[in-house]
Amino acid sequence: MGDLQSLRRALVLYGSETGNAQDVAEEIGRLAERLRFDTEVAELNAVSLKQLLQHDVVLISISTTGQGDLPPNSQAFWKALRSARLRPGCLQRMRFASFGLGDTSYPKYNWAHRKLYNRLIQLGARPICDRGESDEQHPEGIDGSFLPWTATLRNSLLQEYPLPEGSEPIPDNVLLEPKWLLDFADSNGIASTNGTAKSGSNGDTEERPDQALLEIPGGLTANVTSNDRLTPMTHWQDVRHLSLDVEGSHAYVPGDVLTIYPKNFPTDVDQFISIMDWTPIADQRMKFAPSSASVSSTARLPVPTFTVESTTTLRELLTNHLDILSIPRRSFFAKLAHYTSDEFHRDRLLEFTDPEYIDELFDYTTRPRRSILEVLQEFESVKIPWQRVCSIIPTLRGRQFSIASAMTEVSPSPAVKGARTRIELLIAIVKYKTVIKRIRQGVATRYIASLTPNQQLTVTLSRGGLGVTQNELNRPVVMIGPGTGVAPMRALVQQRIQWRHQTPIPDTPTANDLLFFSCRNAESDYFFKDEWRKHIDSGVPLEVFAAFSRDQRQKVYVQDLVRQQSGKVYDAVANKSGIIYICGSSGKMPQAVREALIEGFQEHGELSREDAEAFLVALEKSGRYRQETW
């Protein structure tokens, strides 16, 4: 039976930017394991086209980023797949299934998934079932379409690849063995003396995470120069203007993003250690060791930056690498059910894994934003074996923020060797009270709010999806960025000013750049208003239109401004070859702005509704309508 099973090999691949597609891939991997496939999970960039043909089936999960682009960790794979040297039919021995993660508030919904799917078909690969697609705007989120699709996938896998005679799928109530387990680094479990320090009470102020730098692939060291609150203390939201100096010279353009890697706070880590009864071993050096399940697999380590030689402690893992404050997924409850001796707790945990109780799961987790730590505090009978913690608690991922400045090198001071690159961010600190009257804080923004001048942290810099180039300088831009969506617009305004100084263009633009902004109050969260006025007074070809939704009885939003100034927008776009940029919250805002644009095109272009929509689609196809929302 072992030989027969080894012939049923599944390769699960993902292209992910925020981690959602990776979560989906790992769940698909568990499904395949339960059907007794020898399963490997990896990012798309980690495999060659040749490897696609070395597995019985390839299962793909991919999200769409930017303007219908593939995530960075899949672009090398996509480049290889698009090679003109590949002949039609070269992948005819490949069987696959794919699931896309998208957002219907974007014009190019699930575009990356569809491009990848169609290219695989073009090269001869054959799907074993219909492709699946999720919508971020679905009331039930990803699960709304993922759960039905996985049922179809399971049936297709069993039909195409029947289990060896005498074998049955691994039941859902049987725990899958992780590929890697934690073990003591030394037989005597020597306590750590150089890792994260033990935490304790710090009097009136909350103790902050340690300042040790993290080892991240492509990681850069950034020094905090300022972390200023822009909104008054009386305002409901704390919004920060964070300024960082990054070691070295790093070119970036408007729309690019900086990823900050947060840490959990000592108070939460201590609570987790305490409820799991891990205090005696929390600071002992540990390492990862392969389990029996990884004998025939090239499984990656639970912490991507680790090697088999790396050592750590439970406290370090919980501080730097495990997301103990994230909202748990269904699979988390299934795993917890194995680690309780309380029958009531076990039954309740298993209820949350049943698709019939999806509304109850939503009401328990997503609606009140209940965290993993809080779940464990409520199900106090659950005791996770420390050896398996990395297979149960999800990885703590970096958070991306659109850069709010143009690229500027900072002259090194006598105390600093080498060049530094200034990067500024506009960040809304997530802190609110839930329906169950508990204070919630964003993991990343709570960490960011704690940063102090001269503190160092690890960041990475990556390309965004706006595609701004200097060649567009002779065209006006229409920038629509309410709230913190103004961050990349500020970068764009600054960058265009820099480019004009560096390379004066002979033909001055015949239309001003237009910036549309909205917030709640003119005196509370009108970000960079003095800066806009200074630019305009100095002759920068810029007009700024701002709306304040709470300063009068009738609420005014950014789409209302677009309607009011639709003549200028149409002239800039239709007559001056202008480019439209939209940034900010996903969901209703981009759709409302899109509708306002279409109505303006109808009015000033004397177009029918159908022709106005076609005009907007043409702008998208030509790269003159670009959206980056989150």
Report each predicted region and the residues it spans.
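FNR-like FAD-binding dehydrogenase module
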Residues: 1-630
